[in-house]
Curated annotation (Swiss-Prot):
Cofactor(s) demanded: Zn(2+)
NCBIfam families: PRK05766.1 (NF004424)
Assembly and binders: Part of the 30S ribosomal subunit.
Origin species: Sulfolobus acidocaldarius (strain ATCC 33909 / DSM 639 / JCM 8929 / NBRC 15157 / NCIMB 11770)
Gene: rps14
Cited HAMAP family: Ribosomal_uS14_2_A
BP-aspect Gene Ontology terms: cytoplasmic translation
Function description: Binds 16S rRNA, required for the assembly of 30S particles.
Name the UniProt record assigns to this protein: Small ribosomal subunit protein uS14
Cofactor: how and how many bound: Binds 1 zinc ion per subunit.
Record keywords, A-Z: Metal-binding, Ribonucleoprotein, Ribosomal protein, RNA-binding, rRNA-binding, Zinc
Protein backbone atom coordinates (compact mmCIF):
# COMPACT_ATOMS: atom_id res chain seq x y z
CA UNK A 1 0.00 0.00 0.00
CA UNK A 2 2.19 2.90 0.90
CA UNK A 3 2.65 5.40 3.59
CA UNK A 4 -0.49 6.54 5.31
CA UNK A 5 -0.68 9.58 7.53
CA UNK A 6 -3.94 9.88 9.51
CA UNK A 7 -5.64 13.28 9.47
CA UNK A 8 -4.66 15.65 12.24
CA UNK A 9 -7.05 15.95 15.15
CA UNK A 10 -9.13 19.11 14.94
CA UNK A 11 -8.76 21.65 17.72
CA UNK A 12 -10.65 24.62 16.31
CA UNK A 13 -13.56 25.24 13.98
CA UNK A 14 -16.98 23.85 13.27
CA UNK A 15 -15.89 20.20 13.19
CA UNK A 16 -14.85 20.18 16.84
CA UNK A 17 -18.17 20.83 18.58
CA UNK A 18 -20.63 17.95 18.85
CA UNK A 19 -24.24 18.00 19.91
CA UNK A 20 -24.54 16.29 23.30
CA UNK A 21 -27.88 14.80 22.36
CA UNK A 22 -27.54 13.47 18.80
CA UNK A 23 -23.84 13.84 17.94
CA UNK A 24 -24.40 16.15 14.98
CA UNK A 25 -21.60 18.56 14.04
CA UNK A 26 -23.64 21.20 12.21
CA UNK A 27 -25.18 24.32 13.78
CA UNK A 28 -24.19 23.58 17.39
CA UNK A 29 -25.27 26.19 19.97
CA UNK A 30 -22.41 26.71 22.42
CA UNK A 31 -23.88 29.65 24.32
CA UNK A 32 -24.39 29.05 28.06
CA UNK A 33 -22.55 25.74 27.67
CA UNK A 34 -25.50 24.09 25.90
CA UNK A 35 -23.67 22.27 23.09
CA UNK A 36 -26.91 21.26 21.37
CA UNK A 37 -27.64 21.43 17.66
CA UNK A 38 -30.47 23.76 16.75
CA UNK A 39 -32.90 20.90 16.06
CA UNK A 40 -32.33 19.32 19.48
CA UNK A 41 -32.48 22.74 21.13
CA UNK A 42 -35.95 23.37 19.72
CA UNK A 43 -37.15 20.07 21.18
CA UNK A 44 -35.79 20.62 24.70
CA UNK A 45 -35.74 24.42 25.04
CA UNK A 46 -39.12 24.79 26.76
CA UNK A 47 -38.46 22.16 29.47
CA UNK A 48 -35.05 23.79 30.08
CA UNK A 49 -36.75 27.10 30.85
CA UNK A 50 -36.32 29.02 27.59
CA UNK A 51 -39.46 30.91 26.57
CA UNK A 52 -40.43 32.52 23.27
CA UNK A 53 -40.99 36.26 23.64
CA UNK A 54 -42.91 36.78 20.41
Amino acid sequence: MGKYKPPAERRFGKGVQLCKRCGSRDSVIQKYGLYLCRQCFREVAYPMGFRKTR
